[in-house]
UniProtKB/Swiss-Prot annotation:
Its EC number is 1.1.1.262. It catalyses: 4-(phosphooxy)-L-threonine + NAD(+) = 3-amino-2-oxopropyl phosphate + CO2 + NADH. The gene is pdxA. This is 4-hydroxythreonine-4-phosphate dehydrogenase. It comes from Salmonella arizonae (strain ATCC BAA-731 / CDC346-86 / RSK2980). Catalyzes the NAD(P)-dependent oxidation of 4-(phosphooxy)-L-threonine (HTP) into 2-amino-3-oxo-4-(phosphooxy)butyric acid which spontaneously decarboxylates to form 3-amino-2-oxopropyl phosphate (AHAP).
Length: 329
């Protein structure tokens, strides 16, 4: 990077391991400025529980970004609504979590920050607070007024994007339309080029049905929907292979020559990726007007405040965001 950049981090659920992980991030120096959108006393209390040093520096958008010294974080303060006790969910803090996400998202939209890295939230407690919330991906899509976003998870060796995300199985076949597939593949192809630096990305596309429909004998979605869309996009120059049966696609003879896999639904592609690299994966939202990465795990309430949480996924998410910033410069 030609000059220091500034990224924003949201720790997520205050009763979970998110604050622990952010404190652990601060134990090393970073070539970018880490602005944490959170309650300051929460972070200092959690650092004391973990026995780790932490100094919170005031955030000033008018001051040029600078590399982050070890033992420090730059604080963009948002106040808790109620005390946060590790491991104990509090409905009153649901609005706090959403406020941190909104402020961080707005800062990215206003070009305050070069990227957003999110810690794990607890969807249930946010909804219990009376705030409809499906997940980070949908929240940022709506707030940024993006036309369409795509969820992709990645490890060092594998990238898996999803045509559909949090839908019940009975609704998936109807959701796989030509328009949806066209938009998802176009976004995936575009962001692999612009944010990952791949000039001509090769994308493997899963079928929807067992054996990719077996020539129409196990479902016709491949013939009616998936194949026509792939043919159209290939004619535009995209390097697409498929539809392939999901039970045979995830093997070296295919993956060694591919840049990403497009799965038709959540549990078709993600079990393989999480088996291969759980705790080292990153969730990326494609199609947003800014870079957003996230950890690939949950709030782990039972580990909060104990110093047992693994910071590996958060470090990977932050490092990937830095690489993506470089690719977009």
């Amino acid at each position: 990077m030609s000059s220091a950049q500034r990224v924003v981090i949201t720790p997520g659920e205050p009763a979970g391991i998110g604050p622990d992980l952010v404190v652990q991030l601060a134990q090393r120096a970073w070539p970018i400025e880490l602005v944490v959108c959170a309650d300051g006393p929460l972070l200092t209390e959690r650092a004391a529980m973990l026995g780790l040093p932490l100094s919170l520096l005031p955030y000033s958008p008018d001051v040029p970004a600078a590399p982050q010294p070890a033992g420090t974080l730059t604080l963009l303060p948002v106040s808790l609504r109620a005390p946060a006790i590790p491991g104990q969910l509090t409905v009153e803090n649901g609005p706090y979590v959403v406020e941190t996400l909104a402020r961080a998202c707005d800062g990215c939209l206003q070009h305050e920050f070069a990227a957003l890295i999110t810690g794990p939230v607890h969807k249930g407690v946010i909804n219990d607070a009376g705030i409809p919330f499906t997940g980070h991906t949908e929240f940022f899509e709506e707030r940024s007024q993006a036309k369409k976003v795509v969820m992709m998870l990645a490890t060092e060796a594998l990238r898996v994007a999803l045509a559909t995300t949090h839908l019940p199985l009975r609704a998936i076949a109807d959701a796989i339309t030509p328009a949806l597939l066209h938009d998802v593949i176009a976004i995936l192809h575009h962001d692999l080029r612009t944010k990952f630096g791949l000039r001509n990305p090769h994308i493997l596309v899963c079928g929807l049905n067992p054996h990719a429909g077996e020539g129409g004998h196990m479902g016709t979605e491949e013939i009616d929907t998936i194949i026509p869309v792939l043919d159209e996009l290939r004619a535009q120059g995209m390097h697409l292979t498929g539809p392939l049966p999901a039970d045979t696609l995830f093997q070296p003879k295919y993956l060694d020559h591919a840049d990403a896999v497009l799965a038709m639904y959540h549990d078709q592609g993600l079990p393989v990726l999480k088996y291969q690299g759980f705790g080292r994966g990153v969730n990326i939202t494609l199609g947003l007007p800014f870079i957003r990465t996230s950890v690939d795990h949950g709030t782990a309430l039972e580990l909060a405040g104990q110093g047992k949480a693994d910071v590996g996924s958060f470090i990977t998410a932050l490092n990937l965001a830095i690489k993506m910033i470089v690719n977009t410069q």
